[in-house]
A protein has these predicted regions:
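Catalytic cores and adjacent flexible loops of soluble metabolic enzymes
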Residues: 1-299
Length: 299
């Protein structure tokens, strides 16, 4: 499965959160193209606006009100940094229809700070997902033990997060295999592109049994960015996966709505929709003039 993090991790591109216009555009694109899981809100997670002063964003209540028309179209939830846990924020998310909160803490800190947040999320009737941030701080075996502990207290999903984009495909393979062998809950992988390996690492995770891949439209995320959602859909469909996701609806939405909206933020899309289609189809870019002429002739 695929979890799109554009509206959470991608919000780092513009500050700590997208404005209402772009938030709605992204929600439209993701739900209309059948993306199954969406993480949204303040880049620092629910509560970060007040607790951490991440005010370059809408408030949590504004995001939660804005998302109401989209509930039921995808599984929608928010991030929760374990260090910023406040029970009323978890209760608020549940009351506003969130399907999950993804608790996050640095790898190795789960026993110290994550037990109460995870149990509170479950108590409030939501799924408890987890991000082991900076997963490379632990050996694969240590990471697997942390996943086992979290599973034992009710966790529903465990994410291996390559926060600095430093992991190599072999690192991803070992970490994913260890975690998959240790737990029965789904294991996800969240890559960053600092070494240009986001796609290679996502494929390594998939081939090693990962159940969920994190990504963001146009690669939007902190630092060097994430795995582009549209690229993930394109290459995973070559593996016979993500068949229910409408790649062309997604690309049209990016081309016609999201790219123009992001011009005010001077965001550069490294793999524009046209170039992605060339990769999907195996057509060399030198055929561009012919494609355009045929398109013009056929309307």
């Amino acid at each position: 499965r695929l979890m799109d993090c554009t509206l959470r991790d991608g919000a780092n591109v513009v500050g700590k959160g997208f404005d209402a216009e772009i938030t709605k555009i992204v929600l439209d694109i993701l739900t209309e193209s059948n993306v199954p899981i969406i993480e949204f809100g303040n880049a620092g997670g629910i509560g970060a606006y007040e607790v951490a002063g991440f005010t370059n964003a809408l408030t949590d209540m504004e995001y939660l009100d804005l998302v109401q028309p989209y509930l039921g179209k995808s599984e929608i939830g928010m991030f929760l940094n374990a260090k910023r846990f406040r029970e009323p924020n978890v209760e608020l998310a549940a009351s506003k229809g969130m399907k999950f909160l993804r608790c996050g803490a640095d790898a190795g800190d789960a026993r110290k700070i994550s037990e109460v947040p995870v149990k509170t999320i479950k108590k409030c009737g939501m799924k408890a997902y987890y991000s082991a941030m900076k997963a490379y701080l632990l050996t694969p075996e240590e990471l697997a033990e942390e996943a086992k502990f979290l599973e034992s207290i009710g966790l529903d999903e465990f994410t291996i997060m390559d926060s600095a984009g430093t992991m190599m495909p072999d690192d991803v393979k070992r970490a994913t295999e260890c975690c998959k062998n240790a737990v029965k809950i789904p294991v996800a992988f969240h890559c960053h592109n600092n070494l240009g390996l986001s796609a290679a690492n996502a494929i390594a995770a998939y081939e090693s049994g990962a159940d969920i891949l994190d990504c963001g439209l146009m690669g939007m995320a902190r630092s060097a960015g994430n795995l582009p959602t549209e690229a993930a859909v394109a290459f995973m469909q070559k593996y016979g996966e993500f068949k229910d996701i409408d790649l062309y609806a997604m690309l049209n939405g990016i081309d016609q709505r999201l790219l123009p909206a992001m011009e005010k933020h001077s965001y550069h899309d490294a793999i524009p929709p046209y170039d992605l289609i060339l990769g999907v189809s195996g057509a060399h870019s030198s055929f561009g003039k012919t494609f355009n002429a045929v398109a013009k002739d056929t309307g």
